[in-house]
């Protein structure tokens, strides 16, 4: 029997697993979508890779002002291949880290049978504790599923060629980041935000300054605007038809929960995520939840700290989360 079975090998899950092992526990981690979670596979790492390329492109495009004549073509297929290679390398590093610390790895989709049993395919894992670390998934626009034309921040990475034009829906962190990067890489970008300014959860000066420089860079910014309709040609906003090849939805993320499974187990949750206390414990005495699925903060370092706290509680070394010291 394991001291813990952890479902999800993101920055919360794999840190928790390694910490339990270091504290002398027997631990198993289950993963179905690649090691490192959203951050490594579909978030921070590939986005920052694109950002680094965009930074090079921006500098090259400005080089003539400094007396340097340069011409270049962007080959997105090569760029994407290099980016995916970086993701694979980092994910493999996490896998090796887990194995090197004595963590047992099971690949597949987990189903919690009871508070002491987890099923993966036809295999039953018996455990004293369970840690749910299944992360979050993108929120879609009401009435529109993600498909070939409508992309999420997860499915964007499946695109083989950069679109010539794109509408980015949502002017928060992700939307502004994607809009800026894609604009530099040669896409015609429309950035749509329903609030009065970009980054609506930040001071007005930040949103206004950001909008100013985005407009200078050639991005069409539409604030106080809402998508009225999506068509084969593009989108209808404020009564205006905008023709775009792709639509990238960046309106937030939601906990990746199996509500039927949680109800069956009696685990308390709401639309924001699974309810936990400062020990990361649910209302079930041996089931914990960490990371985005708790609805606290969608930050990798928060998930990792939650994983560490959980590991210490599972192994009998009482510990609690202190959210007042989180760097943003």
Regions found by a protein language model. Name each.
Residues 105, 132, 152, 221-223, ...:
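A structural signal for the hydrophobic beta-strands that form the central parallel beta-sheet
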Residues 44, 134-187, 192, 263-265, ...:
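Glycine-rich dinucleotide-binding loop and its adjacent helix/turn
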Residues 278-297:
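Short FAD-binding loop at a beta-strand-to-alpha-helix junction that anchors the flavin cofactor
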Residues 242-266, 284:
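C-terminal catalytic lobe of FAD-dependent flavoproteins
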Residues 5-7, 110, 125-135, 169, ...:
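Short hydrophobic core segments
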Residues 3-29, 175-184:
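N-terminal Rossmann-like FAD-binding beta1-loop-alpha1 element of flavoenzymes
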Residues 2, 18-25, 30-162, 190, ...:
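Glycine-rich flavin
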């Amino acid at each position: 029997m394991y001291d813990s079975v952890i479902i999800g090998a993101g920055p919360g899950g794999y840190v928790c697993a390694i910490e339990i092992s270091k504290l002398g526990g027997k631990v198993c981690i289950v993963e179905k979508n690649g090691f490192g979670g959203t951050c490594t596979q579909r978030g921070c790492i590939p986005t920052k890779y694109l950002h680094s390329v965009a930074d090079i492109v921006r500098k090259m495009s400005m080089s003539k002002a400094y007396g340097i004549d340069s011409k270049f073509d962007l080959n997105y297929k090569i760029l994407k291949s290099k980016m995916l290679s970086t993701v694979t390398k980092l994910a493999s590093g996490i896998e090796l880290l887990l194995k090197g610390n004595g963590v047992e790895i099971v690949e597949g989709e987990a189903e919690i049978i009871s508070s002491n049993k987890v099923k993966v395919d036809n295999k039953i894992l018996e455990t004293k504790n369970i840690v749910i670390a299944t992360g979050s998934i993108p929120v879609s626009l009401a009435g529109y599923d993600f498909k070939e034309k409508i992309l999420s921040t997860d499915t964007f990475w499946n695109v083989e060629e950069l679109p010539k034009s794109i509408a980015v829906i949502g002017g928060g962190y992700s939307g502004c980041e994607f809009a800026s990067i894609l604009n530099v890489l040669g896409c015609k970008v429309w950035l749509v935000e329903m609030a009065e300014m970009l980054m609506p959860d930040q001071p007005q000066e930040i949103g206004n300054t950001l909008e100013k420089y985005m407009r200078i860079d050639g991005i069409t910014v539409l604030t106080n605007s809402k998508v009225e309709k999506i068509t084969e040609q593009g989108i209808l906003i404020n009564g205006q038809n905008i023709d775009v090849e792709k639509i990238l939805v960046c309106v937030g993320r939601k906990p990746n929960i199996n509500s039927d499974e949680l109800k069956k187990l009696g685990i308390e949750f709401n639309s924001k995520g699974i309810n936990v206390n400062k020990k990361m414990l649910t209302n079930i005495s041996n089931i914990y939840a960490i990371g985005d699925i708790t609805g606290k903060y969608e930050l990798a370092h928060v998930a990792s700290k939650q994983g560490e706290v959980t590991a210490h509680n599972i192994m009998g070394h009482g510990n609690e989360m202190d959210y007042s010291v989180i760097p943003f």
